[in-house]
Amino acid sequence: MPVPDSVRLAMPVEAVDIARLQRKAWSRQPGTAAALAAIPADQAVRTWHEAIVKPPLAHCRVLVALSQGQVAGFVVTGPSNDPDAEATDGMVAEFVTDADVLDDHASRLVNAAADTLRADGYETATWWVRSDDDALRGFLIECGWAADGAHRSLGTEDGTEAVKQVRLMTRIADRGPAPNAG
């Protein structure tokens, strides 16, 4: 019987698939070669396993998108660690989909991330996006996210590789019931 496509919390055994997808995504992105080379595949699997079974904070979650029963993407949510963050700000810390299924599973993952952050009590969600990732930024804008003016540059200590990012945000708080018009 076919398994319906869905998004759910990651299972420990899926750490291998998550690490594989992350490494595949990082290998396609300029500026991440040093990070990819510095982390052996088995260490990445152990790190993801730990994040699933013993997250660093109670509100840190790893969600997976399933396609025909296989992991096709993942998203990590948690409290925002930005210096200007409020206690009610959550964030999408990592978002990866298999390049072949972006359209199919990206919206499921984005919606599940927002739902998870909302359920954890956050009112606003933030997301750092590579400044040159027009496809992801455009997709998120279509989903209701907007740039908030913040930007940063991440890179290696020797300065040989740098990734410029812009921050997007969206309001996720429940707006409550509509006022009674009668």
Predicted feature residues:
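Alpha-helical elements of Rossmann-like donor-binding domains used by nucleotide-donor carbohydrate transfer enzymes
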Residues: 17-21, 47, 108, 112, ...
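Conserved GNAT acetyl-CoA-binding A-motif
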Residues: 117-129
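Short hydrophobic/aromatic beta-strand or adjacent loop that forms the aromatic wall/cage
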Residues: 60, 162-169
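Conserved catalytic-core motifs of GNAT/GCN5-like acyltransferases
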Residues: 128-129, 141-164
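Conserved beta-strand-loop-alpha-helix junction that forms the acyl-donor binding cleft
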Residues: 97, 127-137
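Acetyl-CoA-dependent GNAT
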Residues: 9-12, 23-32, 36-101, 110-112, ...
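Conserved N-terminal entry element of GNAT/NAT acetyltransferase domains
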Residues: 1-16, 20, 24, 33, ...
